[in-house]
């Protein structure tokens, strides 16, 4: 219930709560609430009866935070159970001054996303709330120097590593701030720890997990091909590639680096056991519950099957010797995980498990794919380049000095699909010999006869535009997706790279509207994620001879000097 507070007021309060999060608030209204509010006056909303607060066991401020620790997600439990805006505001203001900053930011973001109280509120881009996580240590040090001398500055930020490391050729992909935001926002929309008791069921969360991360690995493989690198192999519990993030926690030191060829003691054996249990379930077609009986997908025996994905993130993030008391690595934070090459190795491993299930399903027949009466007549026929993106570093320091960083990123010229047909369209692109990724999905009603459709790249439903600066936040719809300006097509090469472009048309009565992979409402597409290319295609004729599917070839060029596009 947000009664008594306008959307503009709630938006302003959330902005103020997240401003200079590592310092005490300077807003009088929040100060007054934090000094006078008593959580003990509303004990019914605290699931643990405030034991952590009473015993002085709140995670301390100026310390690193990990969402994989159940105790460090407890503030969300408080905020999600607030029944009124006043209750939400009182608790947020109170705990902002007393609780760990990382835990507070995470709780605010996820609560605003999932609570009715947060409806309509646009959360500031998290890279401006905690900029040190998204920029390298050199830039942050320059920002502090500028702050100390009260000298405005705009600093250039390079990708990590050197040319001696072949993974550096594709660092622009995993280290892209838009990619980092996409990944962390998706995990906020679909938390792995979500319970239906919070208010609703997250529809098709597991399948969405597969599809979203499959898209990331498919795009990453395509980027590697365009840079003359082999596609990524699945992880085998020796991390072949090392990684040095060159990034610091606000408090707690540098993110730890990992050398090449790190072997995990005992992990390989445990992983093989858990892996074999999951693959055995795939072969039998069912899971087991805690009593050893057949289970629904919502109540498997977690102790038996394990949590491979989450455990792997923790293991890779904490690979150092515990006697050195190092903070978690980048893999333990969804904001930074995609920077580490092992992230894509892990998700290729996860993807292969899902593919094993998909390959066990019967292939689609021509009757499954075809839409009677619909024919795609033609698809008319891209140069990529690097540009810079300005990141505001205002929350990285204390004094009000204009400080920002320029980050290099891949970009492309705006383009359009010209299609003669009808109905719900899906558009896929892949290198001629490897991997596919969805570029767009949209709904279009058609009239009898020929329909000419022009679809602009900026309208793609699987991408989002750049986020607004926190200072410019007024009315901007929150959403998550891969960055429109750089990730919808592949970097390619200066001499060009051939891609196959597929357009498919589906029956809207069977599909539904287009929301793509994000949102907290019921997923509107009833077909499997990635349909019709999600299963094996033993006979290409079934696929290519369907009148509602059209394949064409495009050539993508990369302009090393930037600017012009083909």
Swiss-Prot record:
- What is a single Pfam family found in this protein's UniProt entry? Hemocyanin_N
One GO term describing the cellular component? extracellular region
Statement: the UniProt record of this protein carries the keyword Transcription regulation: no
Q: Which InterPro entries match?
A: Di-copper_centre_dom_sf (IPR008922), Hemocyanin/hexamerin (IPR013788), Hemocyanin/hexamerin_mid_dom (IPR000896), Hemocyanin_C (IPR005203), Hemocyanin_C_sf (IPR037020), Hemocyanin_N (IPR005204), Hemocyanin_N_sf (IPR036697), Ig_E-set (IPR014756)
Q: What is its main location?
A: secreted
Provide the binding site for Cu cation A.
183, 187, 213
Expression by tissue, per the entry, reads: Hemolymph.
- Gene Ontology terms, MF aspect: metal ion binding; oxidoreductase activity; oxygen carrier activity
Q: What are the disulfide bonds?
A: 82-87
This protein's UniProt keywords: Copper, Disulfide bond, Metal-binding, Oxygen transport, Secreted, Transport
What Gene3D superfamilies does the record point to? Di-copper center containing domain from catechol oxidase (1.10.1280.10), Hemocyanin, C-terminal domain (2.60.40.1520), Hemocyanin, N-terminal domain (1.20.1370.10)
Q: Binding positions for Cu cation B? A: 309, 313, 347
Localization annotation: Secreted, Extracellular space
**Family per similarity comment:** Belongs to the tyrosinase family. Hemocyanin subfamily.
Give a short account of what the protein does.
Hemocyanins are copper-containing oxygen carriers occurring freely dissolved in the hemolymph of many mollusks and arthropods.
Q: Which PANTHER family match?
A: FAT-BODY PROTEIN 1-RELATED, LARVAL STORAGE PROTEIN/PHENOLOXIDASE
Q: What else is known?
A: The B chain contains two copper-binding sites. Three histidine residues are ligands to each copper ion.
Q: This chain belongs to which protein, by name?
A: Hemocyanin B chain
Species assigned in the record:
Astacus leptodactylus
Upper lineage is: Eukaryota, Metazoa, Ecdysozoa, Arthropoda, Crustacea
């Amino acid at each position: 219930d947000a009664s008594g507070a306008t959307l503009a007021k709630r938006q302003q309060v959330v902005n103020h709560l997240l401003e200079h999060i590592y310092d005490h608030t300077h807003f009088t209204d929040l100060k007054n609430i934090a000094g006078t509010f008593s959580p003990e006056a509303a004990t019914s909303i605290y699931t643990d009866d405030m034991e952590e607060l009473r015993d002085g066991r709140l995670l301390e401020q100026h310390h690193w935070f990990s969402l994989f620790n159940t105790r460090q997600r407890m503030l969300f439990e408080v905020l999600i159970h607030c029944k009124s805006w006043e209750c939400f505001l009182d608790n947020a203001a109170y705990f902002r001054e007393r609780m760990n900053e990382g835990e507070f930011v995470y709780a605010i973001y996820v609560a605003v996303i999932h609570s009715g109280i947060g409806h309509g509120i646009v959360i500031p881009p998290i890279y401006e709330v905690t900029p040190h996580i998204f920029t390298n240590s050199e830039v942050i040090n320059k920002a502090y120097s500028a702050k100390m001398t009260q000298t405005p500055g705009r600093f250039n930020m390079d990708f990590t590593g050197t040319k001696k490391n072949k993974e550096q050729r594709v660092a622009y992909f995993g280290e892209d701030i838009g990619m980092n935001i996409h990944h962390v926002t998706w995990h906020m929309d679909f938390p792995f720890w979500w319970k239906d008791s919070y208010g609703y069921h997250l529809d098709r969360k597991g399948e969405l997990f597969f599809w979203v991360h499959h898209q990331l690995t498919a795009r990453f493989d395509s980027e590697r091909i365009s840079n003359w690198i082999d596609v990524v192999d699945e992880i085998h519990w020796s991390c072949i590639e090392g990684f040095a993030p060159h990034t610091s926690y606000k408090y707690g030191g540098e993110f730890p680096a990992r050398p090449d060829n790190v072997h995990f003691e005992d992990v390989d054996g445990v992983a093989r056991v858990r892996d074999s249990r999951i693959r055995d379930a795939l072969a039998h077609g069912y899971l087991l519950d805690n009593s050893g009986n057949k289970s629904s997908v919502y109540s498997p025996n977690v102790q038996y099957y394990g949590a491979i994905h989450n455990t792997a993130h923790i293991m890779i993030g904490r690979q150092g010797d515990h006697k050195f008391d190092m903070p978690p690595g980048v893999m333990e934070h969804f904001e930074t995980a995609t920077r580490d090459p092992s992230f894509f190795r892990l998700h290729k491993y996860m993807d292969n498990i899902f593919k094993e299930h998909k390959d066990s399903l019967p292939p689609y027949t021509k009757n499954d794919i075809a839409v009677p009466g619909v024919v795609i007549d033609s698809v008319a026929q891209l140069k990529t380049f690097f540009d810079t993106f300005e990141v505001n570093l205002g929350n990285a320091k204390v004094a009000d000095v204009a400080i920002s960083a320029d980050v290099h990123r891949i970009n492309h010229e705006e383009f359009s699909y010209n299609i003669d047909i009808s109905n719900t369209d899906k558009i896929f692109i892949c290198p001629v010999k490897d991997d596919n990724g969805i570029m767009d999905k949209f709904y279009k009603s058609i009239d009898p006869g020929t329909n000419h459709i022009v679809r602009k790249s900026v309208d793609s439903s699987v991408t989002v535009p750049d986020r607004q600066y926190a200072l410019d936040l007024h009315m901007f719809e929150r959403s998550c997706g891969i960055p429109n300006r750089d990730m919808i097509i592949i970097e390619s090469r200066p001499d060009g790279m051939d891609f196959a472009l597929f357009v498919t048309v589906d029956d809207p009565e069977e599909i539904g509207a287009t929301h793509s992979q994000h949102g907290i409402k019921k997923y509107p597409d009833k077909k499997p994620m990635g349909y019709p290319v999600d299963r094996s295609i033993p006979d290409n004729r079934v696929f290519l001879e369907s009148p509602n599917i059209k394949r064409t070839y495009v050539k993508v060029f990369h302009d090393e000097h930037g600017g012009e596009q083909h």
